[in-house]
Amino acid sequence: MESIIKEIEMMMELPLHERQKAYFQDLLNAAKPVTIVPAADVLEDYELDYIRHVIKPKPKECYRNSHLLCEAFPERILYCEGKTNVPIPIDHAFNKVGDAYIDITFEFALHENPSIYEYVTFGEYDAKTI
């Protein structure tokens, strides 16, 4: 779970403008490695059905997918922005349920096991904030 953070640290070693250095330092300070679990481990059956039949997650729409899930269940699901390695780091959105993290884009839209990838969150937001 360190390659995304190492990438940020390597960027800070480059000859950057002060604003760029400040950006990467803020990113590094906010970075929190997380582990993704299967949605079925933390969601109820009706929530899983809602994802499949109402949200209908789509590939390349992680921000939309995660946002809609947070809005559907605002009392228990947070929206997260960060990065994942697949195998290169990409900006990505996923969700937090209690103390667990899920990725409905990888799991439902791409039919992949997201737990095999490295994830880092830079921010976790409730429905009112996003």
What do the predicted segments below correspond to?
Residues 1-130:
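A structural boundary/capping signal
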